[in-house]
From Swiss-Prot:
PROSITE patterns recorded: G_ENGB (PS51706)
UniProt protein name: Probable GTP-binding protein EngB
UniProt KW Cell division keyword: yes
Pfam families cross-referenced by the UniProt entry: MMR_HSR1 (PF01926)
Recorded family membership: Belongs to the TRAFAC class TrmE-Era-EngA-EngB-Septin-like GTPase superfamily. EngB GTPase family.
Residues that coordinate or bind GTP: 30-37, 57-61, 75-78, 142-145, 173-175
Organism: Citrifermentans bemidjiense (strain ATCC BAA-1014 / DSM 16622 / JCM 12645 / Bem) (Geobacter bemidjiensis)
Highest taxon above the source species: Bacteria
Length: 214
């Protein structure tokens, strides 16, 4: 996809605040400090469309950005940051669960993992959540420039085993070298296609234990 324009539309915490209209949505999710902001900024050719907070866990809203006239890019709160107050964490779960389980515009979620880190329980729970709601995941492994080829292979094996993923489901990315940018866009474009829209349905199944978001 050639990105000509990207603009912030609004923030939301509940369905009444979501943007109106029928534009399809691709959401981005991952732990705090996993490189989500850098990934989004590289994809849309912007330096600071999505800003990295100086304090992990500060992002508490679902943020909607319109890309061209084609789709909404949705920035979800990061999860897994231990210092966020418990009361705030409890507010985030229903917000996230409602969006992922009920939002009809949602076509898929880019689930972001750090190549240097073993997937956490929150990562496993997020993937289980997406599967339970029949939301297609795009798994993107970030910060690949920070490890050797051998370490990438070792960590990939760990990720595939823990998350029950196949090799072809992993998409490697580096914000520094732009490795993987085209591949990630290809995955997104596939989910935005009319054929994908006909097969993507939001399930009403009960949610598994969900990650607490930061």
């Amino acid at each position: 996809m050639i990105v000509k324009q990207t603009e912030f539309i609004k923030s939301a915490t509940k369905p009444a605040h979501y943007p109106e209209g029928n534009l399809p949505e691709i959401a981005f999710a991952g732990r705090s400090n996993v490189g989500k902001s850098s990934l989004v900024n590289v994809l849309v050719n912007r330096k600071n469309l999505v800003r990295t907070s100086s304090t992990p866990g500060r992002t508490q809203l679902i943020n909607f950005f319109q890309v061209n006239d084609d789709f909404m890019l949705v920035d979800l709160p990061g999860y897994g940051y231990a210092k966020v107050p418990l009361a705030v964490k409890k507010e985030w779960r229903p917000m996230m669960e409602t969006y992922l389980s009920k939002r009809r515009n949602l076509r898929g979620v880019v689930l972001i993992l750090d190549i240097r880190r073993t997937p956490t329980e929150e990562d496993l729970q997020m993937l289980a959540w997406l599967r339970a709601f029949s939301v297609p995941p795009i798994v993107v492994i970030t910060k690949c420039d920070k490890v050797s080829k051998n370490e990438r292979a070792r960590q990939s094996a760990v990720i595939m085993e823990k998350m029950q993923l196949k090799k072809e489901e992993l998409n490697y990315f580096s914000a520094l070298s732009k490795e993987g940018k085209d591949a990630v866009w290809a995955r997104i474009d596939a989910l935005l296609s009319p054929a994908a829209a006909e097969t993507t349905e939001i399930s009403g199944d009960p949610a598994p234990s969900a990650p607490v978001n930061d």
